[in-house]
Amino acid sequence: MRDSLDDDESVPYENKKMEKGLKCIRTYLDTHFESDEERTKYAEYVYKNMTFFVTSLPDNYNQSSLNKYFERMNSTGKNLEGHEIVKVKLLHKLSANKEIFTKAWNRVADMDTPCFKVRRRDDENESGMKERIKKAILYRFSPQELFNDNLLNGLKESEEEASGCTIKNVKESSKAPAKNQRAGDGSHSVMSFSDFLLQCLYRFLCKKGKDTGDITVFFNKANLVDTFEKRLISQGCNQEIEEFFSTLVCYRILLDVYFIRILDGQGDYDYDLETPFLEKDDAVKTLKMFESMLYVNSSPVTYYQWFNMLIDIVNTDSPVEPEILFASLKSKDDETHPKEKLKYDALNYEDVDRYWFWRLDFQIWLKRRELFIVGDDTTPQIRRALNVAEKYVFKRNRSIEHIAPQTPLQEDTLKLEKNDLNSFGNLVMISSEQNSALSNSIYQEKRARVESFLDSSRSGSIESLKMLHAFTFNKSWSIEAIKEHGNAMFNILLNSYDNVDK
C-alpha cells in the first residue's frame, strides 16, 4: 500500500503477478478514499492491525480433513485453530516486545520440528555443540537472547529481512511451492501444540497459586480459548503475559532436550531422544525406555503428571545427565505409585491398574539379560526372546488378555476357577487387534503363534514382555504355572522399588 501511494519507480525487478495485486489495491484505495491523507491513514491502520496466520498442516491430513480445515478458515475467521486465537489475544495484551514474542511463539508452535537442535550443527564440533546447549539452557527464559545468539531453530533473520527486501521485489517463480517449507527431522512431539499450551498454562498458574478448576475441563482442547481467556488473558497484566511467553519458550526447549519424540515411519513406531551425552548410550537408552513408559501410561488429561515431574528436575542452569534424570524421574514416579499400593490380589482382571503392566514390562526390559540368560547351552528360543526384548517398544496397548482363555474355542483339559482365571499370573496387556487374533485360542496355539512371531514365520510382534516371558519358559500352562509366573512377575514389581543402581 505504501508503494502504491509513493509510486516508487526504483524497484529493480517487476513481478507481474505482484503488480496485478498492487493494481487491485490501488483501485480499492482510489475508489473508497478521496484524499491521499485518508488513503495513508487507512494503509497505516491495515499495517498495524492485520494478522497473518501461517500454518503448517500435518502431513497426515487427508482430503476430508483439509476440506474441513479450509471451511473453518473461510467462515470469517470465527473458527480458526484455538491456539491461533489465543496467540492474537495474548499479543494484544502486550505493550512492547510483540515482534520477538511473535517469532518465539511461531517457532515453539511447530511441534513437528525440534525448536532446539541438540545434535551437532554442520559448522560446530562436539565441544561447540555442548557450549551452545549450555548457553540455550542458561538463556531459556529469554527469547531475545535466544534470538540474538541464533540458538533456536528458525529464529535467525533471513538475508532478505536484513536487507529490507519488500514483497514488491519478490521474483516470480514457475515452481510449485514445496510441500514442507521447513524440513523436519523425521520425528514429532508426543503432544500437540494445544496440549503443550495447556500444560504450560497449568504449571504457570500452579506456580502462582492460582485456581485451575476441574482438571478434565482444563485440559480439554475444545475449551482452549475459554480456558486461556478465563485463567490468563482476562486477569493477567502485561508483565504476566510476557512471563508466560518466556515460560512457553523455556519449557519447549526443555521438552526438546530432555524428553522423547515419536519417530515418523511407514507403519513403524518408535521413539527418539536427542542428547548431548553421546558417550552414554546405555544411560540414554534406559532414560528413553522409562520416558516411553511414562508417556504410554498418560493421556492429554494426565500429561501434566510426567510433564511437571520432568520440568521440576531439568529446569536448572546446567545440563542434567541422563542417569541423573532417569533416577529422579523414577523416584518421583515411585512417589506417585507407592509400593504400599502394590497388592497381588488387586492385580486381578476386574481391578488391575494398567500402569502395573507397563511398569512390569519396563522392569523386564531393564533386567532382560538376567531374565533371558544367554550362554553356551542357551536354547534358540531364549536367544530370540532376548533379541525381541532388546528391541521392545512401548505402545498404548490397553487390552487385557487371558493367557488361558475364558471361553476356549476347542476342548481344553485345563479347568480354572474364576480366581485363578482372572489372577495376575494369567493376564497380559496387548493391543485389541492382537487380543482379537489370540482371543479364545488354547495355550498351545497361542504359544505357537508367539513362537512364529519370534522366528518371523508369521507377521506380528511381541506386544508384552510379560507374555514373552510366560511363553518362553512354559511349554504348558497349569494352575501351578499361573501361580509361579504370577509370583515371579509380582516380585519383579516389588523389587523395582529398590535403588536404581541395584
PLM region spans:
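Flexible coil/loop and intrinsically disordered segments
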Residues: M1-K502
